[in-house]
């Protein structure tokens, strides 16, 4: 994956629509745990860069990599640490978008080096795509969709401007 990321250096943005939630099982840090009784192998592995560290370094060097997040209602997540600003006008947009209690994150080291994080969801439970949400409410945080975050990173924007009903005398008509 690091090599693939390096090959996309000229792309305006590169995105991964999968979640890297667990350490690479073939990385040196994982192999050291598996073969902890083989001191010679552990010594060699300790001098080898871990695959996840190499991937994180590649993401950082690229500068415009966007990673996906998987919203769910199975867990309660920590606060979303977006890489963008947010200007909200009008009613609270979280009232109008799909709420989730949690999300499956990527490894911390990968998220720290990424340029953006976007939600990967089709906004319903029946797996039929009717609409693609622009934002989702994940544990009280407004999280952009992966496609929207890719565009933000590709054009170099730093902030989202979200206009909800009542922003410019527009009425919600009691609908959420």
Where are these regions (language model features)?
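Non-transmembrane functional regions of envelope-associated proteins
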Residues: 1-176
